[in-house]
Amino acid sequence: YTVAQKALHWIVAIMIIAQVVLHEGMVDAWRTFERTADVSGLSSPVVLLHVWGGLLVLVFAMWRLALRRNRGVPPVPADEPALLKFIAMATHVVLYGLMILLPASGAAAYFGGIEAAGEAHELMKPVLIVLIGLHVAGALYQHFWLKTDVLKRMTHG
């Protein structure tokens, strides 16, 4: 991976963790707004960090996809079982999709008041968390059990 690809990977990872942490504050403000029509909570620092942080995740995800298209990525280990190759590919495709769909649906809910977008946003969150867990578990499995360089390629290798 290029330096830019590695940097964007870790920046987006940190930003997504922050999004998960800030999520409950966003939900609380939104529910208060729905109950009372009081918009003041929708401009709180926690809400604004969640909204604008999400949009940055979207921008960085698009940048990552452009780098991936233009620079490519290292090949998977040649002796990797076909099932693991498929799981890795599918996980990456869905993770990239969620890095686009979650911010887009959140923006549609926040800026456009589209309730269905907010509901979709909520439904995608646990899927993202599970896939992040799978992604991390896969990297650790590659590193400690299969003894490949997959993890090192995204850190210092």
Label the predicted regions.
Residues 1-157:
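Membrane-embedded alpha-helical bundles that constitute the cytochrome b-like, heme-associated redox core
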